[in-house]
């Protein structure tokens, strides 16, 4: 699937009898068993909303997401969660975790909440190698993709041959990923 152009995709504001377990995403990849690839280009905005325990611009449960551009932001979840992109590999029927791959080549990523988990994986599948993140471009507001705590101290999501450089974005501290 390809998403490109101008405009916005906004996650719904959930009214849920149990909002502590609900999740909402502007785009979810991999909900079906045989998931493929989504490619995101251009000036599209993906915006997670509040009103759910998890509120993401993009939630990946199985498959691959390639981000070449766009703006990804979230207002944070009810619990203060700030994941803009969350890799939540699924483990169906007691089997093994499904593979999730995120490749970022460009775009802007930000949250109105605490950015310490701006890009994040579910812990167990990340440790098992079932969630892979390679960042080769983009601007990350309040989050250093080369040195963060999303998966423990000094987590580095930046691909070999690239580095993150501190900058500002709309007056806020940010990091831009560039070639070395």
What are these regions (language model features)?
Residues 1-113, 121-143, 152-180:
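Surface-exposed loop/turn motifs in large extracellular/passenger domains
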């Amino acid at each position: 699937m390809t998403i490109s152009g101008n405009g916005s995709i906004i996650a719904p504001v959930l009214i849920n009898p149990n909002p502590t377990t609900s999740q909402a995403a502007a785009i979810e990849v991999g909900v079906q068993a045989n998931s493929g690839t989504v490619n995101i280009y251009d000036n599209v905005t993906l915006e997670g909303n509040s009103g759910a325990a998890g509120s993401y611009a993009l939630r990946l449960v199985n498959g691959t997401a390639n981000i070449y551009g766009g703006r990804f932001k979230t207002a944070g979840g009810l619990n203060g969660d700030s994941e803009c992109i969350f890799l939540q590999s699924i483990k169906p029927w007691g089997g093994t975790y499904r593979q999730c791959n995120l490749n970022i080549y460009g775009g802007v990523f930000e949250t109105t909440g605490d950015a310490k988990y701006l890009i994040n994986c579910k812990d167990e599948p990340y440790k098992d190698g079932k969630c892979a993140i390679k960042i080769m471009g983009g601007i990350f507001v309040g989050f250093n993709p080369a040195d963060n705590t999303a998966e423990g101290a000094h987590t580095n999501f930046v691909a070999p041959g690239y580095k993150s450089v501190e900058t500002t974005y709309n007056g806020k501290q940010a990091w831009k990923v560039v070639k070395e």
